[in-house]
């Protein structure tokens, strides 16, 4: 839960006065908004690895679950070095760098294996990570956040026609909004914090997210029809302030980089197990029903997005590299 505004402002004021160095130790401030358990565990594993491998010369200070604000606020705090490391959705990152918009392309990845090959390919990812360097931060890694699927309050999506006119919450992403329009729905961009009440009050007919939204955000209480169309696999992105990186020694940078890579593998291993637990909990606690569908009509409906990519040279070039890296 977020702190009240005046408490958060006081915390930020205090943080801004604290030195990066304290009694011979380097303090890295790692902040994140509400997350799935595998991502939380991976972030804490990252911190443990850094502290262990530096012999305690670097300590990691955590600000979890939105203590310092939502994801956009955390990016802005990372830009100015108040936060050293944060984790945000690449969907949000689209508003900071167009390159991140490629991960919002619908039905881009057919399998998890394809997805992992692309995300672990430095020729694909390094230009994306470095695209925000002039803004004061860069990407340094990624975490799996699963596939985004539709879930509805009154009836399941079994055919593309079932989406027609439905008010669906999406992230503030141009590509996500265009995707929903092509599928016949009425996309509504709003913060995650507003979704539960909006579903409950009928402002929304449904939303789209991974299975953790059903339990962590308790959306399964008010929208229990979950359909696997897997329209996107939008990764979470680890960001570091360039101010922070400049203060670390080359050896410290190497240790942090190795810890990030280890935490990525840690999170991958945990993801599938936690998803299955979440599915079972959603059925038990909220009577959620899960549906599989034929994705082909959905894929055909969004083809205009791909047809328009050639008019966006940077994005089209990245898309081509992704297609090559899949194999």
Swiss-Prot record:
Superkingdom to which the source organism belongs = Bacteria
Q: Is Cell membrane one of the keywords UniProt gives this record?
A: no
Keyword list, A-Z: Signal
Q: What Gene Ontology cellular component terms go with this record?
A: outer membrane-bounded periplasmic space
- Give the protein name, as stated in the record: Uncharacterized protein YiiZ
State one molecular function term (GO): carbohydrate binding
GO annotation terms (biological process): transmembrane transport
Signal sequence extent: 1-24
């Amino acid at each position: 839960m977020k702190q009240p505004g005046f408490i958060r402002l006081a915390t930020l004021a205090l943080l801004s006065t604290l030195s990066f160095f304290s009694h011979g130790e380097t303090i890295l401030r790692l902040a994140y908004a509400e997350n799935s358990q595998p991502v939380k565990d991976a972030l804490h594993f990252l911190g443990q690895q850094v502290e262990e491998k530096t012999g305690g010369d670097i300590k990691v200070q955590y600000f979890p679950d939105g203590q310092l604000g939502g994801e956009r606020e955390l990016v802005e705090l990372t830009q100015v070095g108040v936060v050293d490391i944060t984790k945000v959705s690449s969907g949000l990152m689209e508003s900071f760098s167009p390159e991140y918009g490629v991960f919002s392309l619908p039905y881009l990845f057919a399998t998890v294996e394809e997805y992992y090959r692309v995300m672990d390919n430095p020729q694909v990812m390094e230009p994306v990570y470095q695209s925000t360097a002039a803004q004061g931060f860069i990407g340094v890694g990624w975490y799996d956040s699963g596939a985004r699927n539709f879930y509805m309050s009154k009836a399941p999506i079994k055919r593309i026609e079932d989406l027609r006119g439905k008010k669906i919450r999406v992230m503030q992403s141009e590509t996500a909004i265009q995707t929903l329009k092509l599928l016949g729905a009425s996309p509504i961009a709003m913060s995650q914090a507003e979704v539960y009440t909006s579903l409950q009050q009928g402002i929304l007919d449904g939303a789209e997210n991974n299975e953790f939204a059903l339990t962590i955000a308790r959306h399964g209480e008010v929208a229990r029809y979950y359909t696997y169309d897997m329209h996107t696999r939008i990764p979470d992105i680890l960001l570091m302030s360039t101010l922070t990186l400049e203060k670390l020694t080359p050896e410290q940078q190497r240790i942090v980089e190795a810890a990030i890579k280890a935490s990525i593998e840690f999170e991958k291993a945990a993801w599938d197990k936690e998803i299955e637990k979440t599915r079972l909990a959603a059925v038990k606690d909220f009577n959620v029903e899960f549906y599989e569908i034929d994705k082909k009509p959905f894929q055909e409906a969004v083809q205009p997005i791909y047809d328009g990519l050639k008019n966006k040279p940077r994005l089209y070039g990245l898309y081509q590299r992704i297609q090559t890296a899949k194999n």
